[in-house]
Curated annotation (Swiss-Prot):
The modification N6-acetyllysine is found at K239, K242, K256, K259, K268, K417. GO terms for biological process: apoptotic process; autophagy; blood vessel development; canonical Wnt signaling pathway; cell differentiation; cellular response to dexamethasone stimulus; cellular response to hydrogen peroxide; cellular response to hyperoxia. It comes from Rattus norvegicus. This is Forkhead box protein O1. The keyword Nuclease does not apply.
């Protein structure tokens, strides 16, 4: 191996030659290496070492090949060098070695070189013309300019130009993709040896790319099945140069077109909607546009026009927050106030809602689960008052919205309401009511289920302290005129019903006075399952225990057996919920008996205004819970029960 260079030195004709590189871009020009084949040995030979001319030719050949590659890659920079007024140092060094100022150096540069003349190398026909020593300067740039004008390895034609020639050369002016490949291999010398699959991958991909890139080529579907499409020239011309890709351009155009179509469709729809309404104003046809000035002309004004009816409808159902001033509007009629405050949804309900004196009606208890629909007729209750001629019993009828028809009136506004409770009852307001003054035993008929929003006024305007007393259980069969006890087991159990002491109703309805009485006996056969009592207004009492009210029979006869003046409580006697049991309002006398003079009657520890504003006006629940339970008190009236038929309608 070490002697190999010596063998080469003895026989310079077999020097190693540089092998051309294949499948590279840009391809090196073979003529420059072939021209220098005799002097391109990497190993110095004896003849070349002894011959200075051979050494100079070797240096010049290496400089030419190196300078060619630099000029091929940096064509613009070399042209700048040619336009320079003088030789650059690199070009001067190359010229000193090979007798040239540069590939693109003109005679105007004025460069002087002292290199000895050398014979022109011989090469193949494709080799650029040799530069003679005398005309080396003016002819040096000619081959380089020719090579720089070539756009591709096969010439100045681009792929698009080659494809155009291929399609135009066909008889039908159309070719398939495979036919274009074949034409390239046959017609272009550069692609003759690149028809195989290994070397054709690059240029075939370029052809496909150019076919789809340029708009001058169009694809036509082939008639036959399973055949590739025809590629033709666009008859409308199209762009021959590079244009944006169809896919990107179509995406942009489609998105913009879709937006414009959407705007046009909206405008058309708005115009049509405006034309459909003949009575609308001219600006109404643009009402659907959110940014138009007339966009709020129709829809929003309709909403504002229905604002007041909506609030009034909310007021009609206790679901909305009501103002307490509503009940104090004097200019409204009774029926008007009732229609605004109380819900009209109860179809079978009477025109007025019940007072606390009518809570004991079984029609209310029977239908409490049916949204307070009164499905039963009012029952009868006999209240017998026996007193001396000097005694006067003042009872108050329930306030009704209907005009007062009663003829029994009294200047005294005191009145009492007697109720019983198994559920939470809202306090009944105070209103001026008729009083019953009678020295005889009379029957005060219970009115129907009548109540009023004016009862709220009573809560706000009451002066005397409200009393919620739990009556002590007293034997109902024994009359105690001296002890002045109002019995009937006032704190009602789950199976007992305390009837209300009704008063003369505004409608003067006597409730079945034909009930037979048993003065000495009281049958408490009423069974109230759970704590079921309706509210004054749309309230849901303790529904967990309020299952069903069975028909009850409760006898009651109230003999008032000693002279007195029994006046009702000045404000109200409310039945409220305390552990599910109602408490009966007590008769408050103008003068307490001697045994009760020192007893302090506690005032309810609650703010009625806050209760009205928060609980009653908010609607859903009107369940008043007064936690203070007053001690049992006895009052100067004995109660005798009479048999009374509580038969539901």
């Amino acid at each position: 191996m070490a002697e190999a260079p010596q063998v080469v030195e003895t026989d310079p004709d077999f020097e190693p030659l540089p092998r051309q590189r294949s499948c590279t871009w840009p391809l090196p020009r073979p003529e420059f290496n072939q021209s220098n084949s005799t002097t391109s040995s990497p190993a110095p030979s004896g003849s070349t070492a002894a011959n200075p001319d051979a050494t100079a030719s070797l240096a010049s050949a290496s400089a030419v090949s190196t300078d060619f590659m630099s000029n091929l890659s940096l064509l613009e920079e070399s042209e700048d060098f040619a336009r320079a007024p003088g030789c650059v140092a690199v070009a001067a060094a190359a010229a000193a070695s090979r007798g040239l100022c540069g590939d693109f150096q003109g005679p105007e540069a004025g460069c002087v070189h002292s290199a000895p003349p050398q014979p022109p190398p011989t090469g193949p026909l494709s080799q650029p013309p040799p530069v003679p020593p005398a005309a080396a300067g003016p002819l040096a740039g000619q081959p380089r300019k020719t090579s720089s004008s070539r756009r591709n390895a096969w010439g100045n034609l681009s792929y698009a130009d080659l494809i155009t020639k291929a399609i135009e050369s066909s008889a039908e002016k159309r070719l398939t993709l495979s036919q274009i490949y074949e034409w390239m291999v046959k017609s272009v010398p550069y692609f003759k040896d690149k028809g195989d699959s290994n070397s054709s991958a690059g240029w075939k991909n370029s052809i496909r790319h150019n076919l789809s890139l340029h708009s001058k080529f169009i694809r036509v579907q082939n008639e036959g099945t399973g055949k590739s499409s025809w590629w033709m020239l666009n008859p409308e011309g199209g762009k021959s140069g590079k244009s944006p890709r169809r896919r990107a351009a179509s995406m942009d155009n489609n998105s913009k077109f879709a937006k414009s179509r959407g705007r046009a469709a909206k405008k058309k729809a708005s115009l049509q909607s405006g034309q459909e309404g003949p009575g609308d104003s001219p600006g109404s046809q643009f009402s659907k546009w959110p940014a138009s000035p007339g966009s709020h002309s129709n829809d929003d004004f309709d909403n504002w026009s229905t604002f007041r009816p909506r609030t009034s409808s909310n007021a009609s159902t206790i679901s909305g927050r009501l103002s307490p001033i509503m009940t104090e509007q004097d200019d409204l009629g009774d029926g008007d106030v009732h229609s605004l405050v109380y819900p009209p949804s109860a179809a079978k309900m009477a025109s007025t809602l019940p007072s606390l004196s009518e809570i004991s009606n079984p029609e209310n208890m029977e239908n409490l689960l049916d949204n307070l629909n009164l499905l039963s007729s009012p029952t009868s209750l006999t209240v017998s008052t026996q007193s001396s001629p000097g005694s006067m019993m003042q009872q108050t009828p329930c306030y009704s919205f209907a005009p007062p028809n009663t003829s029994l009136n009294s200047p005294s506004p005191n009145y009492a309401k007697y109720t019983y409770g198994q559920s939470s009852m809202s306090p009944v307001p105070q209103m001026p009511m008729q009083t019953l003054q009678d020295s005889k035993s009379s029957y005060g008929g219970l009115n129907q289920y009548n109540c009023a929003p004016g009862l709220l006024k009573e809560l706000l305007t009451s002066d005397s302290p409200p009393h919620n007393d739990i009556m002590s259980p007293v034997d109902p069969g024994v009359a105690q005129p001296n002890s002045r006890v109002l019995g009937q087991n006032v704190l009602m159990g789950p199976n007992s019903v305390m009837p209300a002491y009704g008063s003369q109703a505004p409608h003067n309805k006597m409730m079945n006075p034909s009930s037979h009485t048993h003065p000495g006996h009281a049958q408490q056969t009423s069974s109230v399952n759970g704590r079921a009592l309706p509210h004054v207004v749309n309230t849901m009492p303790h529904t967990s225990a309020m299952n069903r009210l069975t028909p009850v029979k409760t006898p009651l006869q109230v003999p008032l057996s000693h002279p007195m003046q029994m006046s009702a409580l000045g404000n109200y006697s409310s039945v409220s919920s305390c552990n599910g049991y109602g408490r009966m309002g007590v008769l408050h006398q103008e003068k307490l008996p001697s045994d009760l003079d020192g007893m302090f009657i506690e005032r309810l520890d609650c703010d009625m205004e806050s209760i009205i504003r928060n609980d009653l006006m908010d609607g859903d629940t009107l369940d008043f819970n007064f936690d203070n339970v007053l001690p049992n008190q006895s009052f100067p009236h004995s109660v005798k029960t009479t048999t009374h038929s509580w038969v539901s309608g």
